[in-house]
UniProtKB/Swiss-Prot annotation:
Residues 1-38 are annotated as: Transcriptional activation (acidic). The keyword Metal-binding does not apply. Residues 59-87, 392-431 are annotated as: Disordered. The record marks L443, C444, L481, G482 as: Cleavage. Residues 59-70 have a biased composition (Polar residues). GO terms for biological process: cholesterol metabolic process; positive regulation of cholesterol storage; positive regulation of transcription by RNA polymerase II; regulation of Notch signaling pathway. GO terms for cellular component: endoplasmic reticulum membrane; ER to Golgi transport vesicle membrane; Golgi membrane; nucleus. This is Sterol regulatory element-binding protein 2.
Amino acid sequence: METLTELGDELTLGDIDEMLQFVSNQVGEFPDLFEEQLCQSYQGNNAMDTTLPKAYNQAAQQPYTTSAPQPQLLPVKAPPQATPQRTAPLLQPRPVVQTSPQPQLQQQTVMLTPNFSTAPQTRIIQQPLIYQNAATTSFQVLQPPVQSLMTTQQMQPVTIQQQVQTVQAQRVLTQAANGTIQTLTPATVQTVTPHVQQVPVLVQPQIIKTESLVLTAVKADGSPVMTAVQNPAITTLAGTLQTTALQVPTLMGSNGTILTTMPVMMGQEKMPIKQVPGSLKLAEVPKEGERRTTHNIIEKRYRSSINDKIMELKDLVMGTDAKMHKSGVLKKAIDYIKYLQQVNQKLRQENMALKLANQKNKYLKGIDLSSLVDTSIGMKIDEFNQNALMMSPPASDSGSPAVFSPYSVDSEPGSPLLDDEKVKDEPDSPTGLGMMDRSRMLLCTMTFLCLSFNPLTSLLHPESGQYSERAVQHGTGRTMLGVEMSGFYGSWFDWLIPTIILWLVNGVIVLSVFMKLLIHGEPVTRLHSRSSVKFWRHRKQADLDLAKGDFGAAALNLQTCLCVLGRSLPATRLDLACSLSWNIIRCSLQKISLVRWLLKHSPGYCKKAEFQDEATTSARDAALVYHKLHQLHLTGKLPSNWNCSGLNLALCAVNLAECAGNKISPTLLAEIHLTTAIQMKTSFPSRFRFLTAYFLGYAQNASSEETLPDPMRWLAHPLGKYFFINSNWALKSAAKDSLYTSTRNPANPVTQIHRAFCESLLEKAMYTMAKPETSKAASEEESCEFSRAQEYLKLLSGFADSVGNVASLPLGGSSPMSSADPICRWWYSVSSMAIGWLQGDDSVVKSHFAEVERIPKLLDSDNPLVKAVIHMCRAMQAAVLGKCDGQQNSFYHCEKASAFLWNSLNISSTGNTNLNKVVQLLICDLLLSLRTSLWQKQSSSPAAGDSIHAPTPALTGFQRDLSSLRRLSLTFKPAHCKLFLHEATVRLMADASPTRTHQLLQHSLQKCTALANKQGDLDSLPGQRERATAILLACRHLPLSFLSSPGQRAIMLAEAARTLEKVGDRRSYHDCQQMMVKLSGGTAMAAS
């Protein structure tokens, strides 16, 4: 059993002071809590003999905690006529559920006689003790939080008024003078009368110490019940005390008061708590109450600190007047930090570019190379460490270690190149610095001047010069001697040796210059060096920016990559001129096989395999960066003030890609040369087409047809190559969805040209359907009229399935994955369905109708032209089905398509206007042909020469479509070939005068003549299908007087049948055969 002495040894003055401060703070939060009770207590002491019945409301008890209890008051109801008595406030009780009804309160006066010990001063504690009855025989002592302490020089007995419940047992707490507590046995109190009596309790004063006062309440069995005392000067300890049963003599006074004298029995272990010096701190585990109290204080301070910092963030970011919740403040702060990081990154990149430019300027001024290398190395290392410090995030809490990885990137996954263990802390070699383009051009100019004037000639032939001077000075006689001397010195051997030596020296000089320019002058980045780490960091960030579509940030990161590699974009016109001139010279030299062989077998190239591998790797990385910058420049994502910037980027990419050798894939090499061909076509649209053809052929030779990627396979076709070289296409800087193709990669010019090629194929296919070939060679061919259109559609279907990914591709090259163009596929199905209807093939119409109904999400389905196409296809499908209500449904969809077509003509089209007009012409022709077919089906096979008047709705719709065709013919010349035929048809449907109808049909029967040489005249002439349809209409609906003899009509029908069979119109061919059968039967009957 732990004694009080041991407990006293464990306590320190610091612990006691901390607890006292905490208790005083708790009490200070309720300053006026006990003012009323103290006033009532004072009045109760003055009138002790007055009795007052009180009603006591019992409150719900709360769970007991070891922390400082909060005072709780129970309301006391007093009648107005009674004198107010003092009521003691109840503190936090034990969690014992009371089930008994409210007991009556009885006040008794108990006289306690404690033991005294001599002390200079006496402290008197006035404490009301409240005894509460529970369901069990145990009791709880509730002690108020405020005690009034009085000190007197003389020991005087005082009375303490207490409210005592009528219970089965009572516990009385006494304080010993030496700091210990004696617990008495339960005393039985008998209630004589049912009313409440006032019993004063007389307690003798006792001498205690404030530092060692301990109060402990125990049960009858000796276990402690309550160990917390709300007193700033009292330390509460729990311990098992020895209890001794005492007989309490009870005396009854004359006035009904009960006087009880209770002797106090002291415990066996009665030692005061030792005072520990304040400077001594015992390392011990804090008790439960202290731990929770300290934890609460820490939590409160932590929350206060967090709130203060959040308020400080709000003041910094949004100002002091802004109002926003904590999460909003943190979000704004995060956005502002990201913005500052981007600004710092841009400033660091500009700083790096300026430092590199400063280094190159110093190099040109003739500064010692070794000192420049050392300075640049130290500067780069310091800047790299500073950048790492700025890029690394701060520690999340104060307990986190203050170390960081200088190569960690938050936005990228872990990479072996970014590990600190694998990064070599080695400086760049002197050859890795490279030469500037101005230095290269200066060296080339000096070499050319040296070879032009050739000062070595005078050094190798000094005698010939001296002899010529002597011959001139000594006249004719010396001239003969001179001739003899010249024959002696002018032998072929004397001439050959100096010449060979001269050319050898010149060759060595030229080869040395080439080695300096092409090998040693190239900047080389060492593998796993700090420059390499920084390069890959920015290149990965550029890939992420391209994937997100942030082309400005991607271009900035790519330019930073060039600066890290020792290369930078030209900043002035002089730099651009020098760079472009050097790249043209280098491209010309690399195409010469002898120069490539000499450079490949030179000592500087073969001196070290590791250096060669690093040089080719650096060339490959630089070529990829130049290639991506060139793509951004061509697509308008990298604006430039100079026209030759794109040409310079293209030549840089080509030269470095050829220097990379096997380090670069054939697919990427072909893509680089193809992009250069696009640049040549853009820079020289009408001249120097051989340059475009040269780079295009090199791209095709660099990669075979098997390894050629799908997005570039269309260039292997003759139509694709012809379109690339001779067509007037233009790159679109803004890649948006159109009515005919879906969006390609906005940063890849090859995909943009592929998109233009697909639209060109679709335009040719639809134009061939709407206006077939009218030339004499085409008319003599036995092939189908729509065969050329079917070839175009077949090519379109194949190339639309190999578009390539729409998202931005990484710098490593094109992605092998390919995707189809859903919009191109949809228009392919529409065109195939139209060809099936014109050929009379119902199976083709039914097979493609399901694909037409699946409208792509990327297609603008709200466009009137698209809606007209959809309703036109539905009308054809309803006419083909042949159901009882098929004609009615077909007529309904024809009306819908006609209305949308008229709206599309009123709207100014944006995009490919020629293709829009071709589609509108095709829709007009199909709608008019479909209405003519429906009218002929309703005519119920009339005899030759008879005509049936069409219904008014059908005639109105036909006239509206004919008006659309007339309006389209004003701006589109090929619409004239359809106009005469459909005007004759509407006159037949209206049963108009046959004279004008015959003239219109006669115009449709015209053939191509030798006078129609212009393209406009050819476009206005009708095709073979229109001539055959005009013959059928004339033979079926015109009167017999407008035609020749029956034999001539049979000849015309036979010619129309051959034409329809050649063009592949099965439906019209079947109708023509039926007319020929009827005509032959009628002729036979007339002849008989």
